[in-house]
Amino acid sequence: MKKFKMVIIALVVALLVPSSAFASSMETLGSGEWDYIGYDYFRTQSKNFYSGGGDFMICLDSSSPKGNYYLFEEDPYSRDDKVAGVYFNGGSGDNFYKVGNLPHCHIFRDIGGFVDGTNDRAEFYVSRSTDTGEALVGAYD
């Protein structure tokens, strides 16, 4: 019985401690790499995505409606700041490019001036002027 308990304890410990092969396969994001923030399905305005500054990237799903997409920085006590706009045409003749394995991405460069507030973050959201269907956006910082 004592030997059986030792085998069970050894098995539990082996399962709780990650192997070096598993640990080395985990990706560590560092400076100069894109950190995934999240995604949102939206019709005219996405949820807020928090950015620490530098560059900010959005990626649209190919099923997202064609048209103008705008990046805004939310200001709770004043008018929201329009960062920039970009036209999405489904990947043909627009300003969206493949970044790594992510198709239909646009990078907004040098947006650190929009970082504000007590959380020292910029609160970005993506907006569309017309509701022509549901868009799917992914955000990266």
Predicted regions and their residues:
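Post-signal peptide N-terminal regions of Sec-secreted extracellular proteins
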Residues: S24-D141
